[in-house]
């Protein structure tokens, strides 16, 4: 969600702060700002909208100073205006914040009664006023920081400047991530290591409850009680990452076309392509012995988990309990300490998923993390980490991370089946051989379907509602297709199990309703054809995504039929996701929306 950066050193910082913010644009934001201390005075520039607006403001009114903090805001409390943009100032204090202060209304009333005058609608401003109050009460800077942290409740990552200390940034973490970067004669602060990659690859991650005093030559870290603590310094792999679209119009387009390569890379970590066997990955979770598996995630990662559920239950005969992370821990699920749980998150920082992970840890379950960021909080708090190895994904709408999550879950399910004795050695080899073929087939599909997709997308861009249908693993895929379309084109779309058509959605069908049916010629195909006939009988405009055999067998008039290669069931979700991604992408391009940073969305949702 929001992005935080800070630099303290001997060189001017404002331009470098903005460059660091650009590396956090993928998180989503609606306003931005920078504050520095120059000649003993706090100064700031803020702007609504994209970073180009802030850059324009800085060209008109440059900021000097060798210490500064900066922020991209994703609105939670208060409208996305310049007035509500961070940094927030009170007397002698500048604050940037990612998160939600849950008791801000109570604190605001208390501070206002004491004479504080609030200038914004944000929850963050109470932090600045608390710090000013404690300084007026005679507390030193560190004492004021510690006292403030004792008062605020909720999730926060904070960076603070005190006007009377032009050589120190203070920071705190409780929930959203914060990374401290170590330089030579300068230090850095960022919401993640990607922001700091141009400056340093030596990173220290704060953990929940930590707060830090960062100077030019080092950092002092304290726990919530004020005790000095040590946190390990590590080398980040984010340093190799460059924000570059290459020859593509958008990051999303680039990431769609990267999928054959990144999936081949990911699978190489989990299977032996020569012997067509799965590779043992972790001793921490024994899939051969666990009686059941829980899966929790949000958004697209949750839909990947739903598909994974089919695989674990079919190939490993392993019962799976799955729910969206925001609901998971409130259901009071009876959990067995002998069971295991998988948590799926691209960023590894998703707040609801992390909370569900901690809920399962409290109940004694073994924890596995299916993440893209191996240095993330979810990864660090898990017993086993299953990296998806997708590389940085900048587009807010997930594409390559989704298919890499599926590839990893498929490999884990086959490995679990082998460990449980529910698939034979020959079946294991056949399944792994199918997985090994997947990158080649994905490349073939991406090179062949674009013209048809573009033509169809032009028509879809004129629609107001779209229905997606599927059975088996194509049902979660239908939900994913609908999610992609609504995320980036802002067209209302819903994904349903095809068998549920008669239980409500059929009431929406008329000659204006496109119905996208995902129907490989599998064991569900005949039933899905029956559903298509019901749509056709009511004048619905059918868009069929199937394979050669399905196209020949359907015998239905369709608005469009997209024909894909015939593939094994275990790789069908990854192959059939490609036209869904391209359909959403090109429709959004025709609609003229901000494809990579769609309105109101954030890449990494770090608050509940």
From Swiss-Prot:
This is Glutamine--fructose-6-phosphate aminotransferase [isomerizing]. GO terms for cellular component: cytosol. Signal peptide: none annotated. Keywords: Aminotransferase, Cytoplasm, Glutamine amidotransferase, Nodulation, Plasmid, Repeat, Transferase. Its main location: cytoplasm. GO terms for biological process: carbohydrate metabolic process; fructose 6-phosphate metabolic process; protein N-linked glycosylation; UDP-N-acetylglucosamine metabolic process. Gene3D superfamilies: Glucose-6-phosphate isomerase like protein, domain 1, Glutamine Phosphoribosylpyrophosphate, subunit 1, domain 1. The active site is at residues 2, 603. GO terms for molecular function: carbohydrate derivative binding; glutamine-fructose-6-phosphate transaminase (isomerizing) activity. Residues 2-217 form the Glutamine amidotransferase type-2 domain. InterPro entries: GATase_2_dom, GFAT, GFAT_N, GlmS/AgaS_SIS, GlmS/FrlB_SIS, Ntn_hydrolases_N, SIS_dom, SIS_dom_sf. Residues 281-422, 456-598 form the SIS domain. It is found in: Cytoplasm. The keyword Transferase applies. The keyword Transferase applies.
């Amino acid at each position: 969600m929001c992005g935080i950066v800070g630099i303290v050193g001997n060189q001017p910082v404002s331009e470098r702060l903005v460059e660091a913010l650009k590396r956090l644009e993928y998180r989503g934001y609606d306003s931005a700002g920078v504050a520095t201390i120059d000649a003993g005075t706090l100064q700031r520039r803020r702007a609504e909208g994209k970073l180009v607006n802030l850059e324009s403001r800085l060209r008109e009114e440059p900021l000097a100073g060798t210490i500064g903090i900066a922020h991209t805001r994703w609105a939670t409390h208060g409208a996305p205006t310049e007035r509500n943009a961070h940094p927030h100032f009170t007397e002698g204090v500048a604050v940037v914040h990612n998160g939600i202060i849950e008791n801000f209304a109570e604190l605001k009333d208390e501070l206002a009664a004491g004479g504080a005058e609030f200038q914004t609608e944000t929850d963050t401003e109470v932090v600045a006023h608390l710090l000013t109050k404690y300084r007026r009460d005679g507390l030193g800077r560190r004492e004021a920081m510690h006292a403030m942290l004792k008062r605020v409740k909720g999730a926060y990552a904070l960076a603070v400047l005190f006007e009377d200390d032009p050589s120190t940034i203070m920071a705190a973490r409780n929930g959203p991530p914060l990374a401290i970067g170590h330089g030579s004669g300068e230090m850095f602060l960022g919401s993640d290591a990607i922001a700091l990659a141009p400056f340093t690859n030596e990173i220290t991650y704060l953990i929940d409850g930590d707060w830090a005093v960062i100077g030019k030559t080092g950092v002092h870290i304290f726990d919530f009680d004020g005790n000095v603590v040590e946190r390990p310094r590590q080398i980040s792999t984010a340093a190799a990452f460059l924000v570059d679209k290459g020859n593509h119009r958008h990051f999303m387009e680039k990431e769609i076309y990267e999928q054959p390569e990144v999936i081949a890379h990911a699978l190489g970590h989990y299977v032996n392509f020569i012997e067509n066997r799965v590779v043992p990955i972790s001793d921490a979770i024994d899939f051969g012995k666990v009686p059941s598996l829980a899966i929790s995630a949000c958004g697209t990662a949750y839909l990947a988990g739903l598909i994974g559920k089919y695989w674990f239950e079919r190939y490993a005969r392993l019962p799976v309990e799955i729910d969206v992370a925001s609901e998971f821990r409130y259901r009071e699920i009876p959990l067995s300490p002998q069971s295991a749980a998988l948590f799926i998150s691209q960023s590894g920082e998703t707040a609801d998923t992390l909370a569900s992970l901690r809920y399962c840890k409290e109940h004694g379950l073994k924890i596995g993390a299916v993440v893209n960021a191996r240095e993330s909080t979810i990864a660090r708090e898990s017993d086993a980490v299953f990296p998806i190895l997708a590389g940085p994904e900048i587009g807010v709408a997930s594409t390559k991370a989704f298919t890499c999550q599926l590839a990893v879950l498929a490999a884990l399910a086959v490995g679990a089946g082998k460990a449980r004795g529910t698939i034979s050695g020959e079946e294991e080899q056949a399944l792994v051989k199918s997985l090994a073929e997947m990158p080649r087939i994905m490349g073939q599909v991406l090179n062949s379907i674009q013209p048809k997709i573009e033509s169809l997308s032009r028509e879809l861009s004129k629609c107001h509602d779209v229905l997606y249908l599927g059975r088996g693993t194509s049902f979660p895929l239908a939900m994913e297709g609908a999610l992609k379309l609504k995320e980036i084109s802002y067209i209302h779309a819903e994904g349903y199990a095809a068998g549920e058509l008669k239980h409500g959605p059929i009431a929406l069908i008329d000659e204006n309703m496109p119905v996208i049916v995902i129907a490989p010629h599998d064991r569900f195909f005949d039933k899905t054809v029956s559903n298509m006939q019901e749509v056709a009988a009511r004048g619905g405009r059918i868009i069929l995504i199937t394979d050669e055999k399905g196209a020949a067998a359907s015998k239905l008039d369709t608005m469009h039929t997209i024909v894909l290669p015939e593939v094994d069931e275990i790789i069908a979700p990854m192959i059939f996701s490609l036209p869904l991604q391209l359909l959403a992408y090109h429709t959004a391009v025709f609609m003229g929306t901000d494809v990579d940073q769609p309105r109101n969305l954030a890449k990494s949702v770090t608050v509940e």
